[in-house]
From Swiss-Prot:
NCBIfam families reported in the protein's UniProt record: GTPase_YsxC
GO biological process: division septum assembly
GO molecular function, one term: GTP binding
Annotated HAMAP family: GTPase_EngB
Name the record gives this protein: Probable GTP-binding protein EngB
Family, as annotated: Belongs to the TRAFAC class TrmE-Era-EngA-EngB-Septin-like GTPase superfamily. EngB GTPase family.
Domain EngB-type G: 26-200
Length: 200
């Protein structure tokens, strides 16, 4: 079966709002993280080839839970983490979903890597670098995806790619992927990288 066909068999399992509601799987998990409004939902819909799998919104900070999606029955679990950095939610709500994120990332036995999205239109913010440093300190592997590349010039894209190369990171997985959910650029490459990670 072709990789895109495998990824398109996507089933929403649960939106977990507390640790006890995390599903108990024994298959590979790959998490998607990023700053609020970076395009996580659009990317999930693009790689699963279904605009309805993840709700998209122009309002930052909409995802306040961890969403679990089962791919192709037993191929893998795609984990949509809440966006960090901006939200009109209460401080208590924000603290809760940040705790959920941290608990999941530190305790999941099946997590292979985090796909970390960076809005290339905005570039790397301090909060992105803080999250990268946290992943590095906790020895969590991650792959960087530059999103919304259709909105910037090649020069700006190259500046961001070179910036990553100069960070001297230890747990980043290459290549850095440049993607546009709108035009499906880089989506095939990302699906391939996901499949390769699971096969290892």
């Amino acid at each position: 079966m072709k990789l895109k066909a495998i990824m398109s068999k996507c089933e929403f399992i649960i939106g977990a709002t507390h640790v006890k509601s995390f599903p108990n799987f024994s298959i590979p998990e790959i998490a998607i993280a990023g700053r609020s409004n970076v395009g996580k939902s659009s990317l999930i819909n693009a790689i699963t080839n279904n605009k309805k799998n993840a709700k998209t919104s122009s309002r930052p900070g909409c995802t306040k839970q961890i969403n679990f999606y089962l791919i192709n029955k037993s191929f893998m679990v795609l984990v949509d983490l809440p966006g960090y950095g901006y939200s009109k939610a209460t401080r208590a709500t924000i603290n809760n979903y940040l705790f959920l994120m941290e608990y999941y990332l530190l305790n999941s036995k099946n997590l292979l890597k985090v796909i970390l999205l960076i809005d290339v239109k905005v570039g790397f913010k301090e909060i992105d670098l803080d999250f990268i440093n946290w992943l590095e300190l906790n020895h969590i592997y991650y792959q960087l995806v530059l999103t919304k590349i259709d909105r910037v010039s090649k020069e700006i894209l190259d500046v961001n790619i070179n910036y990553i190369k100069n960070l001297n990171l230890g747990f980043v997985i290459y290549p850095v992927i440049s993607a546009s959910s709108k035009y499906k650029q880089g989506i095939g490459e990302l699906i391939y990288e996901i499949a390769q990670c699971i096969k290892k």
